[in-house]
Amino acid sequence: MCIRDSFYTQHASFDTHAGEMAGHPMLWNDVSQAIAAFFDDLKEHDASDNVIMYLFSEFGRRVHDNGSGTDHGAAGVSFVIGDQVKGGHYGEYPSAKNEDLEQGDLVPNYDFRGDYQMIVEDWFGLDSKPIVNGSFETHKILK
């Protein structure tokens, strides 16, 4: 019997509105090192096939800066990481052309609930509809 569980954690705030050119590389370096250490430990314990990691942000960033950074925007990014993930880039980047922006924001073209749906159905083997409140486009990225 395979037991699946879910855990949440968070990293220091990416809620920056200034100094992003200097701050974001440091934040992403911290995140990258933490993920690498976590998966290195999983591999040492022969457990990396049993774990996927979903990274996401609850908000995106605006296209145009405010002078030294960017404010909250509509579209964001997410990552699914693990030995059971078919690597690659999934989805399309939204247009950053001024005429395609909505009130200065990128227009999301993929609902992140599709990632939750995929994880709940394909990883946990459960019905996702009551969890994500519907059905959404998904990317079949698990092996």
Task: Mark where each language-model region is.
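Short, small-residue-biased leader/transition segments that mark boundaries at the very start
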Residues: 1-3
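Active-site regions of oxyanion-processing enzymes, predominantly non-cytosolic
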Residues: 5-8
